[in-house]
């Protein structure tokens, strides 16, 4: 689950981390009230969206007067934000964060993230903060320090000394940096985060290290341990089909292909995506209905896939062990009968009640092509998608 910047800052504030004062507003009058309460004469207004690239795409506005602050807030609160990180979506800006300006001497990058290759957290730092870190890593890899962290959630003294040397911090600044890193690590572990990114971490002209921006992602699988974070979920920042899938209890991820997929089992679903790519096609989604889906869930799942206008072909790939092919067939018939238009449909059914399931589909007059293997189905689906 992604957090908004203000939500991440709320969490970090509880860990006594240095963050400039800020207010969150949903309307211009709320912004005006915050400005008057703080007596700010200048500041920054930031769109609260689940996307990077805000600074480059008009989502962050620096204002040098109260009037400019109000104008910036009014502009952002009516914005549909998009960038190269929104996957083609335009995200509504429902809230803005207002904060005073800070006199910056240097900007740094700091992140703690789960490295799936090494199966452990890593910490990454760079003296080139406030920019696209991907660009720095690609063009100037020597400007990025990356270290694996122990599973204990601590960081060793020699690692902190290496960080201070790499970042060229003198002892007073290194002492501040050490405390910030330790507190960030504590937050990362205690909140079951998969990402905690500070960009930028800044050194002010008076010699203080301050967190200006924060991005945080919580592991969905650990949310049951954090009921206090339930209200942080913002469905307005997600693809509507992702939101509906969560409500239906389905494992769905929108992709950018043209072949809609309905599969049972995550392993089979990933294999299906791979073989579609092998034959020159691409999936429009990952959808695992599991082994205990009901007829209603199958119906809703198919309707969900077909609601994506980029889908040209539907590929249903079921290997029924626990899953009953007759239940899948019944859900398919119900879903197709409710569609105004039909698209080419490729079906591979194997396992429990397969003959009964196929008979139900044939008797209902659902136009489709039955196949007997994964490769045959993938090849046909790719052909029909062209």
Curated annotation (Swiss-Prot):
Which reaction is catalysed here?
succinate + ATP + CoA = succinyl-CoA + ADP + phosphate; GTP + succinate + CoA = succinyl-CoA + GDP + phosphate
State the similarity comment.
Answer: Belongs to the succinate/malate CoA ligase beta subunit family.
Where on this chain does ATP bind? 46, 53-55, 102, 107
- Relate the assembly described in the record: Heterotetramer of two alpha and two beta subunits.
Annotated residues for binding of substrate: 264, 321-323
Q: Which gene encodes it?
A: sucC
Record function comment? Succinyl-CoA synthetase functions in the citric acid cycle (TCA), coupling the hydrolysis of succinyl-CoA to the synthesis of either ATP or GTP and thus represents the only step of substrate-level phosphorylation in the TCA. The beta subunit provides nucleotide specificity of the enzyme and binds the substrate succinate, while the binding sites for coenzyme A and phosphate are found in the alpha subunit.
GO biological process terms on file = succinyl-CoA metabolic process; tricarboxylic acid cycle
Q: Which cofactor does it need?
A: Mg(2+)
For the ATP-grasp domain, which residue ranges apply?
9-244
The protein's enzyme class: ligase
Residues bound to Mg(2+) are 199, 213
Listed GO CC annotations:
cytosol; succinate-CoA ligase complex
Give the metabolic or biological pathway. Answer: Carbohydrate metabolism; tricarboxylic acid cycle; succinate from succinyl-CoA (ligase route): step 1/1
Q: What is the name attached to this protein's record?
A: Succinate--CoA ligase [ADP-forming] subunit beta
Q: How is the cofactor bound?
A: Binds 1 Mg(2+) ion per subunit.
Presence of the UniProt keyword Nuclease in the record: no
**PROSITE patterns according to UniProt:** ATP_GRASP (PS50975), SUCCINYL_COA_LIG_3 (PS01217)
Residue stretches in coiled coil? none
Q: Name the InterPro entries on file.
A: ATP-grasp, ATP-grasp_succ-CoA_synth-type, ATP_grasp_subdomain_1, Succ-CoA_synthase_bsu_CS, SUCC_ACL_C, Succ_CoA_ligase-like_bsu, Succinyl-CoA_synth-like
Instruction: State the source organism's domain of life.
Output: Bacteria
Q: Which GO terms describe its molecular function?
A: ATP binding; magnesium ion binding; succinate-CoA ligase (ADP-forming) activity; succinate-CoA ligase (GDP-forming) activity
The record's keywords, sorted A to Z, are: ATP-binding, Ligase, Magnesium, Metal-binding, Nucleotide-binding, Tricarboxylic acid cycle
Enzyme Commission number(s): 6.2.1.5
